[in-house]
């Protein structure tokens, strides 16, 4: 939620099962997030002219070099992440507290 919010995306309740595509550093003023079902598959194809050194970065950890015609398939993993909750407050209580100064 924090990364998505800082990129201009929506606030999403943690148990909601959805995929959100949020443009980062978009070149147009009408770029908006798209909210999809977590069951949807997203396919991205590299089209047109690609300059040397184009790549895709995954979670800031690994990357691949891309060429015209390459495709990336994004889908929900079968492996779920278990999150640790450190306080007793609800998501909305925490959100209200964090956004109070805005």
Model-identified regions with their sequence ranges:
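Catalytic phosphate-donor-binding core of small-molecule kinases
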Residues: 3-4, 8-102
């Amino acid at each position: 939620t924090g990364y998505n919010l800082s990129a201009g995306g929506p606030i999403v309740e943690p148990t909601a099962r959805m995929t959100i595509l949020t443009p980062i550093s978009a070149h147009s003023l009408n770029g908006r997030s798209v909210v999809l079902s977590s069951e949807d598959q997203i396919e991205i194809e590299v089209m047109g002219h690609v300059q040397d050194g184009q790549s895709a970065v995954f979670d800031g950890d690994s990357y691949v070099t891309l060429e015209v015609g390459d495709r990336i398939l994004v889908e929900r993993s079968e492996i779920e992440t278990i999150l640790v909750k450190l306080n007793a407050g609800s998501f909305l209580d925490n959100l209200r507290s964090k956004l109070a100064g805005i």
